[in-house]
Amino acid sequence: MDNLQQVVSALQSGEVIAYPTEGVFGVGCDPDNPQAVEKLLALKQRPIEKGLILIAANYQQLQPYIDDAQLSDLQKQKIFSTWPGPVTWVMPVKKDISPLLTGKFTSIAVRVSDHPLVQKLCHQFGKPITSTSANLTGLPPCKTVTEVQNQLGEHLSAILEGETGGRENPTEIRDAFSDTVLRQG
């Protein structure tokens, strides 16, 4: 029996949680709750300028954040051909989206994950969650629940129990306009 409902409740309460992704554990929160995002950035000691990735169960969950009218049909086809899967796309962002999510950029990084637990979590929560690697600055990203508990346990309200997808590398990041690979996967 998984602890999915406990994790969803923590998200709904504005807490920071950890969960397995394609390659490593991620830490995340409700992207629409500024206090939760600030908590996450403080936990990670992550500069606001960097922005965060949104991870979702499907494209519809990402649409409130993306200005996809700026993308051509061909660009959308290319994006959809990689999802669900381990490719994060940097896409045009809607004007009212918080700089806590976008950082210094006029775009937002988004992914439709094929990890079954991420799928379940985002479906149950009803929207995307933020995603950044579960580790303290200077330490390697966590790949097991035990590693997450040892590094971050006291700072997290819940950890979604399960295993990562087994990828050795982080997910690839690509630019939706140019199709340039920004981070090799």
Swiss-Prot record:
Transmembrane regions listed in the UniProt entry: none
Record bears the keyword ATP-binding: yes
EC number(s) reported in the record: 2.7.7.87
CC terms in the record's Gene Ontology section: cytoplasm
Subcellular location: Cytoplasm
Record function comment: Required for the formation of a threonylcarbamoyl group on adenosine at position 37 (t(6)A37) in tRNAs that read codons beginning with adenine. Catalyzes the conversion of L-threonine, HCO(3)(-)/CO(2) and ATP to give threonylcarbamoyl-AMP (TC-AMP) as the acyladenylate intermediate, with the release of diphosphate.
Protein's name in the database: Threonylcarbamoyl-AMP synthase
Organism whose genome encodes this protein: Photobacterium profundum (strain SS9)
Lineage of origin: Bacteria, Pseudomonadati, Pseudomonadota, Gammaproteobacteria, Vibrionales
Gene name of this polypeptide: tsaC
